[in-house]
């Protein structure tokens, strides 16, 4: 592939990850979140700290940032799951704003101006673009495959039942809350991976860009247009969204 094609495709892979993980949470778990930008931002800032401060290689730092975001989602879920329906959705947005404010105030995170990634210094542009491209491609494939395997498992059958009727699923012995927490944590980890890819692609992060609610708008559009509650829906939606963005840009 040409360098120009790689540059464009990296965004597509990040969109596939975001759409697939949001669909897992909303399309199967029945959890409509409008605050996943909390973990996109955390993943973006996390990968820079892990690469520049800790010294991890970029691919390892990206994966580690996703794991950190999944870990952050566990305690956060115990707060959010006290809310239901629209209150849950608004609660996730509040959490995202809290993440943003905390990031701005923490020392060493650049305040309102953000941080720059220095781990790629000395690496030529073509190599950097190719590295991020193949990393994004690999992660997008792994996320889709992991979602497919999950939905073919016992947990996936329970999630399908929850999607159709959570009350009936609970009456049949499905652990509704535990299953929902699982997909929330998984989706947050996926958002962290996408945020880390966005950060290493742009080489810079700031609170306003990384914690922007536009990412949630992108995810909702991708899933709705592609097909909510299907494996292939987010992929189709991401391709349509990406094509429209390229044509209208």
Predicted features and spans:
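Transmembrane alpha-helices and adjacent helix-loop boundaries
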Residues: 1-249
């Amino acid at each position: 592939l040409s360098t120009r094609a790689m540059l464009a495709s990296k965004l597509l892979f990040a969109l596939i990850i975001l759409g697939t993980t949001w669909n897992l949470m909303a399309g199967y778990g029945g959890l409509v979140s409008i605050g996943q930008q909390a973990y996109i931002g955390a993943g973006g800032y996390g990968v820079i700290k892990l690469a520049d401060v800790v010294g991890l290689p970029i691919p390892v730092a990206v994966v580690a940032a996703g794991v950190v975001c999944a870990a952050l989602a566990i305690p956060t879920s115990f707060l959010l799951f006290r809310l239901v329906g629209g209150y849950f959705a608004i609660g996730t947005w509040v959490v995202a704003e809290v993440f943003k404010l905390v990031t701005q105030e923490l020392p060493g995170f650049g305040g309102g101006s953000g941080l720059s990634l220095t781990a790629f210094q000395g690496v030529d542009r073509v190599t950097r673009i190719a590295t991020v491209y193949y990393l994004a491609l690999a992660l997008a494939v792994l996320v889709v495959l992991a979602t497919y395997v999950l939905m073919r498992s016992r947990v996936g059958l329970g999630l399908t039942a929850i999607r159709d009727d959570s009350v009936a699923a609970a009456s049949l012995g499905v652990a509704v809350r535990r299953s929902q927490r699982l997909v929330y944590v998984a989706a947050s980890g996926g958002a962290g991976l996408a945020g880390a890819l966005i950060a290493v692609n742009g080489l810079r992060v700031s609170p306003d860009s990384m914690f922007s609610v536009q990412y949630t708008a992108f995810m909702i559009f991708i899933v709705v247009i592609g097909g909510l509650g299907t494996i292939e829906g987010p992929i189709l939606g991401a391709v349509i969204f990406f094509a429209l963005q390229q044509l209208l840009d």
